[in-house]
């Protein structure tokens, strides 16, 4: 029968031998070692941030333009049927769309001013994806997106009833300027909605790029 202590006394175990303590753990990365993959491309993340900042400013400018034109069309649009003058703002649907466009316009102007100030001061145009300012901007963008979509739906519903002659307003069975402007104002509001909706997701697109690095 073999000695049961043979394995213990072999080189497999340290056999209680003392080892000299070390003050420092060995370095994980030695000279000449390739850097970890997640450190590569830090400059690319910064480039993505700059590109998204420019896109954010462009979307704000486009939204302002669409809303200004839409407000002008809604406020000035009127038509005449016999001795009755019809105005777009006589409709509660268009009043709602007009009010939403005003709110979105003011909000986008404020956001654009803040972006320009940050650019002049050399700061980031877009806040970090996890910062409170970014969350507040996202919530405002999302809320205004839904409000604009509701306003667009109200404008389309009004125009559909006008086309069918069920609104009590001008008859739009034929082509006329009044009905054309109604449709144009709704279309411009929809384009403003698209710009706000895209802007609402820019910070989270940045977060995706950061996580992909």
From Swiss-Prot:
Q: What is this protein called?
A: CASP-like protein UU2
Q: Which GO terms describe its cellular component?
A: plasma membrane
Q: Which family does it belong to?
A: Belongs to the Casparian strip membrane proteins (CASP) family.
Query: Basic and acidic residues bias: where?
Result: 14-25
Subunit info here reads: Homodimer and heterodimers.
The membrane topology noted for this protein in its Swiss-Prot or TrEMBL record is:
Multi-pass membrane protein
Predominant cellular place of this UniProt entry's protein = membrane
Q: Where in the cell is it found?
A: Cell membrane
């Amino acid at each position: 029968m073999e000695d049961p202590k043979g394995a213990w006394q072999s080189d497999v175990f340290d056999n209680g031998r003392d080892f000299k303590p070390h003050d420092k753990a060995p370095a994980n990365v030695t000279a000449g070692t390739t850097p970890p993959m997640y450190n590569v491309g830090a400059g690319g993340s910064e480039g993505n941030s700059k590109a998204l900042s420019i896109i954010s400013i462009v979307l704000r400018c486009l939204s302002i333009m669409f809303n200004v034109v839409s407000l002008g069309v809604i406020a000035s649009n009127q038509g005449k049927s016999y001795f009755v003058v019809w105005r777009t703002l006589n409709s509660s649907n268009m009043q709602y769309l007009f009010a939403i466009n005003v709110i979105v316009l003011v909000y986008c102007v404020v956001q654009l001013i803040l972006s320009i100030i940050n650019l002049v001061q050399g700061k980031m145009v877009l806040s970090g994806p996890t910062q409170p300012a970014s969350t507040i901007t996202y919530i405002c963008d999302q809320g205004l997106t839904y409000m604009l979509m509701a306003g667009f739906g109200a404008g389309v519903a009004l125009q559909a009833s006008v086309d069918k002659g069920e609104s009590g307003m001008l008859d739009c069975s034929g082509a006329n300027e009044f009905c054309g402007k109604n449709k144009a104002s709704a279309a411009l509001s929809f384009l403003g909605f698209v710009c706000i909706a895209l802007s609402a997701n820019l910070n989270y697109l940045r977060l995706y790029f950061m996580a992909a690095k």
